[in-house]
Amino acid sequence: CACLVGSEMCIRDRPYAIKDYYDVDPDLATSIPDRMKEFENLVKRSHKAGLKVIIDFVPNHVARQYGSDAKPEGVTDLGEKDDMTKAFSPNNNFYYIPDTKLEGNIDLHRGAAEPYIEFPAKATGNDRFDAWPNSNDWYETVKLNYGIDYMNGHSRHFEPIPDTWVKMRDILLFWSAKGIDGFRCDMAEMVPVEFWGWVIPQIKAEHPELIFIAEIYNPGEYRNYLFNGKFDYLYDKVGLYDTLRAITCGWESATAIPQRWQSLGGIEKRMLNFLENHDEQRIASDYFAGNGSKAIPAMIVSACMNTNPVMIYFGQELGEHGMDTEGFSGRDGRTTIFDYWSVDSIRRWRNGGKFDNKFLNEDEKQLKQFYTRLLNICNSEKAIREGVFFDLTYANLAGWVFNEHKQYAFLRKQDDELILIMVNFDSIPARSAVNIPQHAFDYLGIHRYGEYEATELLTGNTEKLTLMPDKTTPVLLDGMNGKILKFKL
């Protein structure tokens, strides 16, 4: 298990953009002068508790007023030596709009007596290369220059190595030396893959156990960032997340699940699965399922269908609604990342540091118990942690008992342990029956047919079930729920 710690950022009004890559946000400290020591102690405590620490690394953009107060001796600030008369130079850290002041269709006062002044204007983090960003742009950020001249055919200038590459490598090495275990790289595909392929091997040469996770949304670039960029894992947002959300909401058939993993063509073990993150709407929000427990089938699939990692967003296990009307963020089904705020479910669970569940309601307690059991199953069961996967959808199409549009089933196998996982995306309980084809028995090396006593791992209950090639195995499923049935072969 790993805990993801937010970027080493400083907040400036609405934005939450990096002001200093070498510092810890003072707002997160108990004692501001000791904030770096507190971070180092957090890493040590996490390791002592059996956790690993992954921090957020935002390589594409920084705050417009970036300036490091905490950089090590001898380090030159980003932009400090830029030639601001040039729109692009491989030696610059930023992109400029020469001889032009930042104007923008935005409020440059933000309550201040004098407007914010920037001359010359810099390009925004979302690739706006003029001086007129609007409120839909990442106007509070400026894009870092990795040697691509976007305004001249995206021409690449990587020889000699651009200065930004060296600066960002040094930043990664700085945090790696703190004993962390990995980086979640924000919007990694907005940074050239050549940089990642250059920097990740250098970081791993000194810290071989570190992992790199890329936030990436373009399936056409997956292999590029895995094999040329050297990432360990990629976000599976536009594939499995979008599919499971659509099935949970009743917009899509469960038969879409095998289509999604098959489309990955063998890299599915390199994908990071999730049902919530800071950019997406909460499961329990009015914009998604309206109730955290309705995603139990999707969560079982996301966590158990392969050996790849799964991510849980804080409060997801409590069914946090994300329906507060926060300041800048507003009532959008997400927990704000822009405002000072208190998350209701987390606050009640925390209970002044007691973490005793006293102020959680029964639904929250039950959902938390489900997540606790599920994640422990993922770590403790060898067939799920290391085993092979066999999708049963193709053998259960157009059945009169198994509803392939609302139910999904698959097998996991390792050594003499077999696990049958079935979920029901329907709100109505199902008296289902799954057909396990002869090919599954052959592929998984199951040689004994007949009756078994299976243990349902989420509840601990036992069931007598018959495993026979091309014969249906009856399984009762509650609405919006699932079973994880373990057989000892």
Model regions: which residues?
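Hydrophobic or amphipathic alpha-helical targeting/insertion segments
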Residues: L42-P59
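C-terminal beta-strand-rich structural cap/linker in extracellular carbohydrate-active enzymes
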Residues: L465-L489
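Alpha-amylase-like alpha-glycosidases and glucanotransferases acting on alpha-linked glucans and related
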Residues: A17, S31-R35, E40-V43, R64-G182, ...
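Single conserved hydrophobic/aromatic residue that forms the stacking wall/gate
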Residues: C1-G6, I11
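Short, flexible loop/turn elements at secondary-structure junctions
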Residues: D25-L28, P59-H61, M187-V191, I216-N218, ...
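N-terminal substrate-binding region of glycoside hydrolase catalytic domains
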Residues: R12-T30
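Loop/helix patches that line or flank the sugar-binding groove of alpha-linked glycan CAZymes
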Residues: A256, G265-E268, N277, R282-Y452
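Solvent-exposed beta-strand/loop surfaces of large extracellular or lumenal domains
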Residues: G450-D470
